[in-house]
Amino acid sequence: MKAFEVNFDGLVGPTHNYSGLSYGNVASETNIRDVSNPKEAAKQGLRKMKALHDMGFKQGVLLPQERPDIATLRRLGFTGSDREVLLQAAHQAPVFLGAVASASCMWTANAATVSPSADTTDGRVHFTAANLNAKFHRSIEHPTTTRILQGIFNNDQYFAHHKALPPTSQFGDEGAANHTRFCKNYEDKGVELFVYGRVAFDENAPRPMKYPARQTLEACQAVARLHGLADSSVVYAQQNPAVIDQGVFHNDVIAVGNRNVLFYHEQAFLNTSQMLTELEGKLQGCLLKAVKVSDSEVSVADAVSSYLFNSQLLSLNDDDMMLVVPHECRDNPNVKAYLDDLVTRGGPIKRVEVFDLKQSMKNGGGPACLRLRVALTEAELAAVHPHVMMSDGLFDTLNAWVDKHYRDRISQQDLADPQLLTECRTALDELTQLLQLGSLYPFQLA
């Protein structure tokens, strides 16, 4: 049965702000305390979703989460009414408030790791929500992420859902941002590449010195076991610790793959030749096409500032692919020159599409961060909750919803405004009704 890649983009939440919470993420640290525009952020994401839908790609939407997360503040000892909890946190621990108000769940590449049915032993699509244990503000996401995924992929015949791995650094899991699947066609059995930054239980193994490695080998292996992946369908590769120390906090900041194409920077991996040999040996029915970008063409610094590799690599047809990049790639002369040359070389990447995602980019999230890829057969796609699939009508509905509920400016001081909490809950309550998903959020389940 024919299968498709479906991209589920995160809808930016009403509290989108720049709290600078992500050490190791250069953009996040650079833009700390800037004033954000949640309305424009959401609309930028929606415009990308709609444009790709209009090009014929299958596109879905994943919901934002309840923020500020009052339940987490209560777990940290703040008491009283929701308003009192919010004001106590703002006064006593503003950094906590910034964390629980983060809209970071927009980057759905970190929501989960997904293995399609062609790869798994039970023939179902498997989802494991990422524990995101490396960052407090992201570690609180996975319970709601799991509920959202279960609500959208709600058919046990086709879909299997796993809880996040144990919330310890030894099993730090960042989801699909460190995972790429290679195959001939989406319905064919593929090879899943898991990329890790360190080996948790081997202190002598290579690891970065400046910035933390968020993903462990042990987490990758655990997810592969949960999904029932055969050893012949899995490759584990270590990300180069030196590029992590240059701000490459996820592999999708330095490499991207689709079907039988890997687009990567020459410094992306620790043992590149060994990894490519293993991938080529395990990939069935087609040849791996590795498109290497040398340091002389694009430096790691330029790759990080432009997010060249945090792009979407999409199939136009059986042979040709399109790269979806942020506008920052056109603003960087070296990257622009490289892309202009790339599409004329005769390789698999024939086209480049540029999108303005500046609101997300200032927090360190490009096109690839904003989407979770799910390969689905026709029958599986038919079993997906239909009201989250992009259409002309859904685009108009969500734009009107954003116009109704979102602010066009949020500063750090605004996060302590009890009215913002009310606005967020009102918006999300209406959203679950619009998308016909029932109760998903803590305030709805209380």
From Swiss-Prot:
Cross-referenced Gene3D superfamilies: Succinylarginine dihydrolase
Any one GO molecular-function label of the UniProt entry: N-succinylarginine dihydrolase activity
Keywords recorded for this protein, A-Z: Arginine metabolism, Hydrolase
EC number, UniProt record: 3.5.3.23
SUPFAM superfamilies with a match to the protein in the record: Pentein
A GO biological process held by the record: arginine catabolic process to glutamate
Function comment: Catalyzes the hydrolysis of N(2)-succinylarginine into N(2)-succinylornithine, ammonia and CO(2).
NCBIfam families (alphabetical): arg_catab_astB, PRK13281.1
Protein name (Swiss-Prot/TrEMBL): N-succinylarginine dihydrolase
Source species: Hahella chejuensis (strain KCTC 2396)
Organismal lineage: Bacteria, Pseudomonadati, Pseudomonadota, Gammaproteobacteria, Oceanospirillales
